[in-house]
Amino acid sequence: MTLDFSTYKNLIFIGDVHHKLNDVVNQMTNYSNTLFISTGDCSIGVKSFETDTDIFEKIEYILASQNSILCIIRGNHDNPKYFKKNSSMRSFLENNAPHIILVPDYSVIKTSNYNILCIGGARSIDRVFNVKNLDWFQNENIQKPDDNFFNQNDDIDIIVSHSAPLFAYPLEFSDELKFYNSFIVNSYALYDKTLKNDIYKERLLLKGIYEKLNNKHHIQYLIYGHYHKHIESQYNKTKCISLEIGELKQIN
């Protein structure tokens, strides 16, 4: 799916929302004519459909008054079914809150300066302790792109994702899982034997996607959430930005 927002002057990325929804919305009121892109974990689909739609209608009022758009990719704490192209929630938003878009995986957002690839999903490290389809979702992980994806996309400037490739913060893995230096993940892995390998494989998938696209066209930015910390680094002349919870980051 391609989404054209080339008329908006400002581009701002938002870190995980979680419990800071009011703070984030209050910050958004400081901007007009702005395209906001959320890196996920807005808890969409965790509570009832009606609870979500009530919240969206309130945010829609603010966005409409500011002539702004909010695009949301899915995190591991969002229900993946709501981000499908023909989902009931996407249909509701189209008819009742058109300034809010739940972005399907591997959609491309076009702005006046950038082509932005959106990749949702991530593994929950505490999944074995959570309730399926309430606190975590079985298909929460990053999905592989379609076979023809790389043939159709050769001019991506920014990748926005929920998780991060292996080469970006946090640098948890050495070669082939010989060493893993995340205390918190190692703690959960005592009760979840496939956790470390599952995380490794999805971050390796992101790395592979980046490398194939970057070989065709230089990726200027890699922007992501999930890790709840602001860290900036460089890889192959790509600026990698990990966003804090509730952080707004403007890209010129």
Task: Locate the predicted segments by residue.
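Beta-strand-turn-beta hairpins that frame and shape the catalytic cleft
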Residues: 3-12, 107-118, 155-158, 234-240, ...
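Active-site neighborhood of phospho(di)ester-bond hydrolases with catalytic His/Asp-centered motifs
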Residues: 13-16, 36-41, 69-77, 102-104, ...
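Core catalytic region of metal-dependent phosphoesterases/phosphodiesterases
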Residues: 14, 19-111
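Active-site environment of divalent metal-dependent phosphoester hydrolases
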Residues: 18-24, 43-47, 73-84, 107-109, ...
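Short, conserved loop/helix-junction motifs that constitute active-site signature segments
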Residues: 30-31, 59-67, 152-153, 213-217, ...
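Conserved catalytic scaffold of divalent metal-dependent phosphoesterases
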Residues: 44, 73-196
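Well-ordered, non-membrane alpha-helical segments in soluble/globular domains
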Residues: 50-60, 140-147, 202-208
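Conserved beta-sheet core of the metallophosphoesterase superfamily
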Residues: 69-73, 95-96, 169, 173-252
